[in-house]
Amino acid sequence: SVGFKAGVKDYKLTYYTPDYETKDTDILAAFRVTPQPGVPPEEAGAAVAAESSTGTWTTVWTDGLTSLDRYKGRCYGIEPVPGEESQFIAYVAYPLDLFEEGSVTNMFTSIVGNVFGFKALRALRLEDLRIPTAYVKTFQGPPHGIQVERDKLNKYGRPLLGCTIKPKLGLSAKNYGRAVYECLRGGLDFTKDDENVNSQPFMRWRDRFLFCAEALYKAQAETGEIKGHYLNATAGTCEEMMKRAIFARELGVPIVMHDYLTGGFTANTSLAHYCRDNGLLLHIHRAMHAVIDRQKNHGIHFRVLAKALRMSGGDHIHSGTVVGKLEGERDITLGFVDLLRDDFIEKDRSRGIYFTQDWVSLPGVLPVASGGIHVWHMPALTEIFGDDSVLQFGGGTLGHPWGNAPGAVANRVALEACVQARNEGRDLAVEGNEIIREATKWSPELAAACEVWKEIKFEFQAVDTI
């Protein structure tokens, strides 16, 4: 029998290996698989492993020139999803050699590049990834991380406060700078470019950078605190993005910003390297994430996108609020918040964490809570997110009836009151409203804010839990 055995064969013969013992160097993936009717789970799980590693639909002559056993992905476990008839979790192990070092782009191209359009599957969702320590070590990660950021800003023992400047489109650069100054003067640590503020006809990036830098130096001089404004460097080309980051550094500002999903991982990693080399903090916005992560049965869970960002690099990332206007289930959100901040995270399925993850001292990322939050949420946010977080109130600052600076004062007073109460041992979950009410006696600005937002609620069930 000369030649090789041509023809199509079942994936599960080669790629379903329930006895496989995973290696410490393997990248492990947990997929939520919904096969087409009539496709057995083992075949669907094996198909995912094959299509995202070495496999193709038929045996090929060149298979004989390589060691499949060394390079193939393996589906090593399958478990049903409780309460879902046609879904199950497929665990796949990928050998480390399949991936380029230090490239989040290549990791995603390999693992999720092709397989999501596969006909034998009705739907597919990547729920979690275990990044082996050997692979983590090929990434620089966040430019600075939580501790270095606190040291640079000289702010300890409390969450940081931010605010997105609104209206997000249409202000001139000078008026935009005015809004920044008022917020920072009132007591915020940071203000933020909206994610879609790049360089539009009504406000070119260079003008905005200049006026925002002026605003933050003025506010710094007045308050004696270090201030920052996230200057959005996101652009149409990598070269233009770097040009903006370089200009920000020349102005001496502390932090720039990037939209990492629309800008892309390659651009983001370049920017993160530049930021570490030049002492800039990097704020990351997750615009477009819901396109990828909102469906329960198809796409990629945000915890995977968050892990990828920690590898690619960013010092802050938006991560939902649990209490505001956007998605976020408490336990699940706290699961990926810990994945961003902590060095070692134990497997915990109740929090959606499928694998134990060791980050081997890669710097941590500050989670940013923003979206429909206001002073009444402060106790809950302080309790849920703890000190290592950035709380961002856009409308919750600028919507204050007396203006931006009093809005900033109200948020700062509310935050300081919550932190003090917590440090005195009071239970924020139980006494939160009372703590805010007490603080209004000392702050007319806070009293006015409490009056405006006392009835606001965003009560809808989270979509990805329905």
From Swiss-Prot:
InterPro entries hit by this protein: RuBisCO, RuBisCo_large_chain_AS, RuBisCO_lsu_C, RuBisCO_lsu_C_sf, RuBisCO_lsu_fd_N, RuBisCO_lsu_N_sf, RuBisCO_lsuI
Q: Which SUPFAM superfamilies match?
A: RuBisCo, C-terminal domain, RuBisCO, large subunit, small (N-terminal) domain
Give the protein name, as stated in the record: Ribulose bisphosphate carboxylase large chain
- Tell me any Pfam family this protein matches: RuBisCO_large
Check the record and name the CDD domains matching this protein. RuBisCO_large_I
So what EC number does this one have? 4.1.1.39
Q: Which residues bind substrate?
A: N114, T164, K168, R286, H318, S370
Q: Which residues carry this modification: N6,N6,N6-trimethyllysine?
A: K5
GO MF: magnesium ion binding; monooxygenase activity; ribulose-bisphosphate carboxylase activity
Q: Where on this chain does Mg(2+) bind?
A: K192, D194, E195
Entry comment on modification after translation: The disulfide bond which can form in the large chain dimeric partners within the hexadecamer appears to be associated with oxidative stress and protein turnover.
Task: Recite the UniProt keywords alphabetically.
Answer: Calvin cycle, Carbon dioxide fixation, Chloroplast, Disulfide bond, Lyase, Magnesium, Metal-binding, Methylation, Monooxygenase, Oxidoreductase, Photorespiration, Photosynthesis, Plastid
Q: Which residues carry this modification: N6-carboxylysine?
A: K192
Further comment: The basic functional RuBisCO is composed of a large chain homodimer in a 'head-to-tail' conformation. In form I RuBisCO this homodimer is arranged in a barrel-like tetramer with the small subunits forming a tetrameric 'cap' on each end of the 'barrel'.
Catalytic site residues?
Answer: K166 (proton acceptor), H285 (proton acceptor)
Tell me which PROSITE patterns the record gives: RUBISCO_LARGE
Q: Which cofactors must be present for this protein to function?
A: Mg(2+)
Which organism is the protein's source? Eremothamnus marlothianus
Give any Gene Ontology cellular component: chloroplast
> Which principal EC class is assigned to this enzyme?
lyase
Q: Where in the cell is it found?
A: Plastid, Chloroplast
So what does this one do?
A: RuBisCO catalyzes two reactions: the carboxylation of D-ribulose 1,5-bisphosphate, the primary event in carbon dioxide fixation, as well as the oxidative fragmentation of the pentose substrate in the photorespiration process. Both reactions occur simultaneously and in competition at the same active site.
* Cofactor: binding comment: Binds 1 Mg(2+) ion per subunit.
Q: Which family does it belong to?
A: Belongs to the RuBisCO large chain family. Type I subfamily.
